[in-house]
Every structure is written in C-alpha cells, then in structure tokens.
Amino acid sequence: MSKGKIEIIETCCRRCGKSIRTLSHTIIGADDAREKFGSICGGCITPEEDNELTEMLLAAAVRRMSGATLQ
C-alpha cells in the first residue's frame, strides 16, 4: 500500500470478531505497532499488550521527532 494518503479501513478484531476501524498506516511511523496490534479491539487487548503498544508508539514518536521534519 502507498505511504501517501492515510485512509481509515474497517476490519474485524482477530480475537472476538468485533468490527473496528484503523488507519492504513500510521502518521508517526509506528507501522510495526499497527501490524502487531492494529487488528485487536480495545476490549481484547491485555494490559501487557497495552503497555507494549504504548512503548512502541512512544519510541516511534521519539524517532519521528528526533530526525524527521514534519510535512
């Protein structure tokens, strides 16, 4: 998928089947986190996964702010 336009896509939670919406790719470059957790709804994510997700998002934000210019 192109990294240009960000789109909202509808998918299902891979654990419970609930309909969820997510982005085609992330604004801050946290595509690894999106790949790992993007298909899990908020009701199904464990506290440990939530902590890992938060750490991944913070790391991506730091990378983005430390080297890239905002467009």
From Swiss-Prot:
It comes from the Bacteria. Pfam families: DUF2688. The keyword Transcription regulation applies. One of its GO terms (molecular function) is DNA binding. Keywords: DNA-binding, Plasmid, Transcription, Transcription regulation. Residues 9-28 bind DNA. This is Protein KleB.
